[in-house]
């Protein structure tokens, strides 16, 4: 596996690739788990070259503490990527991605950008879309692999690719879950054993609910010791965000299936 720590190194690697080679790209913020691994395996099965990026993007965090406590396990991540036979790891610094600071940003005006995560985390999608645009301009992949867990974000990235005429296909892969139903997330690493017990109770409640009374469901979730930030039906999906202690988790799933594994 080749590791590029800056854009100049990456451009040299990218320019050496044969034009006919199909390139798959998996953007991450590190702290890799089986959800990331499923994306990478999918990319490996469909492309000649797989590029994975690790960049904890500061502009998408509206809470400085969330940014500072985001899990960092670079050496372990490198071992995981090498074991998966990833071709290139792109691991840029903040100075690489924002050489002159965050002077130009994508500001989404779509309705979907102003609800759920957009409402709860002002500026989050602006930072996310800005960095995704930068990463796509740098990597120039044929295929981009994203997880369904960030469904709202995926919808906005699809619009970004369409509106900026980016010649990249988006492949959305199913959410990977623990047996309890809890979606895999890098932030799960910050959960204590007590927190995990609370999470398991929440997903037991969710699996048994028919989502006909969200107010009652809110009370049930809050009774576990968690703090529900929102739960909302949108089309045929249920979206929710909640805190367990200081850890904020999000999820979405089809109403008909619930959070099934």
Curated annotation (Swiss-Prot):
Residues that hold ATP according to the record: 29-36, 147-150, 184-187
Taxonomy, superkingdom: Bacteria
Broad class of where this protein is predominantly found: cytoplasm
Residues the record lists as binding (R)-pantoate: 60, 153
GO molecular function terms attached to this record: ATP binding; pantoate-beta-alanine ligase activity
Subcellular location(s) per record: Cytoplasm
Pathway the protein contributes to: Cofactor biosynthesis; (R)-pantothenate biosynthesis; (R)-pantothenate from (R)-pantoate and beta-alanine: step 1/1
UniProt KW Nucleus keyword: no
Reaction catalysis annotation: (R)-pantoate + beta-alanine + ATP = (R)-pantothenate + AMP + diphosphate + H(+)
Record SUPFAM superfamilies: Nucleotidylyl transferase
Swiss-Prot/TrEMBL GO biological process terms: pantothenate biosynthetic process
InterPro entries recorded: Cyt_trans-like, Pantoate_ligase, Pantoate_ligase_C, Rossmann-like_a/b/a_fold
Active-site positions on this chain: 36 (proton donor)
Keyword field: ATP-binding, Cytoplasm, Ligase, Nucleotide-binding, Pantothenate biosynthesis
Binding site for beta-alanine: 60
EC number of this enzyme: 6.3.2.1
Database matches in HAMAP family: PanC
Protein function: Catalyzes the condensation of pantoate with beta-alanine in an ATP-dependent reaction via a pantoyl-adenylate intermediate.
The family this protein is said to belong to: Belongs to the pantothenate synthetase family.
Assembly mode: Homodimer.
Note in the entry: The reaction proceeds by a bi uni uni bi ping pong mechanism.
UniProt name for this protein: Pantothenate synthetase
């Amino acid at each position: 596996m080749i590791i590029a720590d800056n854009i100049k190194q990456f451009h040299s690697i990218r320019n050496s690739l044969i034009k006919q080679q199909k390139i798959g790209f998996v953007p991450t913020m590190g702290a890799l788990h089986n959800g990331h691994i499923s994306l990478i395996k999918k990319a490996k099965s469909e492309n000649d070259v797989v590029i994975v990026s690790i960049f904890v993007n500061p502009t998408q965090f509206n809470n400085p503490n969330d940014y500072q406590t985001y899990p960092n396990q670079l050496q372990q991540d490198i071992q995981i990527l090498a074991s998966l036979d990833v071709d290139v790891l792109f691991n840029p610094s903040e100075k690489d991605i924002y050489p002159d600071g965050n002077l130009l940003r994508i500001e989404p005006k779509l309705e979907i950008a102003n609800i759920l995560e957009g409402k709860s985390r002002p500026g989050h999608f602006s930072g996310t879309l800005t960095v995704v645009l930068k990463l796509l301009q740098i990597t120039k992949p044929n295929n981009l692999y994203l997880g369904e867990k960030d469904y709202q974000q995926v919808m906005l990235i699809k619009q970004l690719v369409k509106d900026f005429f980016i010649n990249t296909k988006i492949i959305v892969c199913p959410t990977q879950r623990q047996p309890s139903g809890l979606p895999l997330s890098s932030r799960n690493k910050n959960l204590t054993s007590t927190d995990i017990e609370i999470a398991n109770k929440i997903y037991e409640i969710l699996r048994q609910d028919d989502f006909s009374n969200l107010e009652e469901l809110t009370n049930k979730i809050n009774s576990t010791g968690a703090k529900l930030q929102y739960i909302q039906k949108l089309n045929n999906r249920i979206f929710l965000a909640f805190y367990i202690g200081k850890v904020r988790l999000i999820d979405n799933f089809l109403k008909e299936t619930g959070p099934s594994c």
